[in-house]
Amino acid sequence: RGCLDRVYEAVNKTCKNIKKNDVVVCIQGDEPMLHPSMISTVIKKLFSEKKAGATILGMQIVNEQQFKNKNILKIVNDSRGEVLYCSRSPIPYLKKFTKKSYAKRIYGIFAFRYYFLKKYFKTAPSILEIIESCDQNRICENNRGMYIAPFRFVESYSVDTYKDLKLVNNKIKKDTWSKKY
């Protein structure tokens, strides 16, 4: 099982008085270069979108290398911002990549209403979730309710390989926010 399941289990072990509309925020550990305003962005979107049970931070992809990287989850949403699909493949299909392309990526910060998280914990993993190794697709395949929380592009790197770790360690040394922690 994936991130949704681990978050639900952790909340139930640590938060004994949680109520159905309480908000749970998940920050994935492979995203060490997050900016504090990213957290408030997913929470604000959750409160502003009446139909949202979850929000996920999304950023424009600005280079073709990220677009083709299977470790970076790409995201497609409808005109209202509701997430339609997440993939490790380059989506949407682009004849030619440009910095102004529609391509977006997931940045590993999510906000959930507790009842929504509980609902998806009780739902079996979906076919597309298993194929893509992306549990957000369980939400997409089961009545949805997850919205993208758009965030302006900031230089960010996920840590999926040793090469990524070396790159991020060098970037963090120069990062103004990391120095404050």
Listing of model-derived features with the role each one plays in the protein:
Residues 1-5, 62, 154-157:
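A short acidic, often aromatic-flanked loop/helix-cap motif at beta-alpha or helix-coil junctions
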Residues 19-21, 49-52, 144:
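Short, high-confidence coil segments that cap the C-terminus of an alpha-helix
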Residues 34-126:
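Conserved core of the sugar-phosphate nucleotidyltransferase
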Residues 5-9, 68, 158-165:
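Short secondary-structure transition/capping segments
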Residues 1-44:
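Short phosphate-binding loop-to-helix
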Residues 24-27, 55-57, 120, 147-151:
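Short beta-strands and strand-loop turn motifs
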Residues 101-181:
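Conserved alpha/beta core of the MobA/IspD/sugar-nucleotide pyrophosphorylase nucleotidyltransferase superfamily
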